[in-house]
Amino acid sequence: MWSNLLPVVQKGDRLVATTIAITSEVFKFSGQVHLDTYALDVERVSIDLDRYDDVAVNSLRLSLEAIRKRTTEFAFWQRTSKLGRPAYEERALLVAFLVQQLLGLTFRETEGILSLFRSYYGIDRVPDHSTLSRKLSSKRWTTVLERFFQHIVDELPKRSAIVATDATGYSGRKRGWRETKHAQRASEDWVKVHAAIEVDEFVVLSYSLTDSNVHDSREFSNVWDRLPSNVTPKRSLADSAYHGENCLAAARRHGAVPLHGIKKNARHFARPETNYQKMASFWRHWPNRAAALYAKRAHAETVFSMIGALLGHRLKCRSSNGRKNEVRVKLALFNLVQLAMRKEFWC
């Protein structure tokens, strides 16, 4: 295969570099290799520029329309009273929270921009900035935002999925989660998100919010117990933080085959008994096959990066509950934006 490469010419004691011509045949391979197991053919790589232009031009418009569509269909179950000052419509508040995250606005800027969108979203009264800040920190909106997230994922079709589980953090700090040293994360005021990601669709299926000092593995069962009923997990992907027997057993209970990271000193077991021994034996006996199946675990980190790029990793609220509710808005809006780019969402 390497016969097509031009050698380096040696003149006396000097090495003279020549042009190395690597043909495309070098990149055509199949079977199990160290890099990956996908066949790579650079001559067939193509980009649909027309579709890319359509998505780039209409992404914001489709996102705003998706907010209007889903908030109209969602049942708020808001209680009303004939006494006292009339309460703001909760649909208007939810629209405000979603638009604020989508456009990266402050509460005051959100109040101003909603005045332009009053007729588009059918809002009678625009909430002021102090109301938005106070409502987002309330326990009532914790329930509403969790129900709204569930409303979005419940609308997806029934399917089997490969689920990757990972954790990230959000705070008001300028330095992001990935830029923060691991030892500092547990002592700082981060909102830690433990999420289950559908790796093929880049959609957040379920999540759990904790303080930053909670270990990833402790929330694995809670996250998987919250998976929507229309998703049947067939494989569980996670890093070595989730190699414990409780995590593996939780994935098995939901019908998924766990393929998590293992310890560096793990060995092959001739007669494996526990879930971890079975998984470690698979890693040691078929390392290339395990690595190929495990490769999509990185999609969970890709989703976290997409959320940070689209909505930012910094939080505006100062109260503990308000910060968590702000993260709930980010996760629900990210799913909404992802689904709005698909034709099936509008059918």
Where are the regions a protein language model picked out?
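Charged, often Cys/His-bearing segments associated with DNA-binding zinc-finger transcription factors
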Residues: 1-81, 150, 341-347
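Polybasic low-complexity intrinsically disordered regions
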Residues: 7, 81-94, 99-102, 134-254, ...
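Helix-centered, glycine/charged polyanion-binding patches within enzymatic domains
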Residues: 35, 240-309
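Helix-boundary capping/turn motifs
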Residues: 69, 86-91, 106-109
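Short, charged amphipathic recognition helices of the HTH superfamily
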Residues: 104-116
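Short, basic interhelical loop/turn and adjoining N-cap
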Residues: 116-131
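A generic secondary-structure signal for well-formed alpha-helical elements
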Residues: 121, 140-143, 311
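Basic, amphipathic alpha-helical segments enriched in Lys/Arg and hydrophobic/aromatic residues
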Residues: 286-347
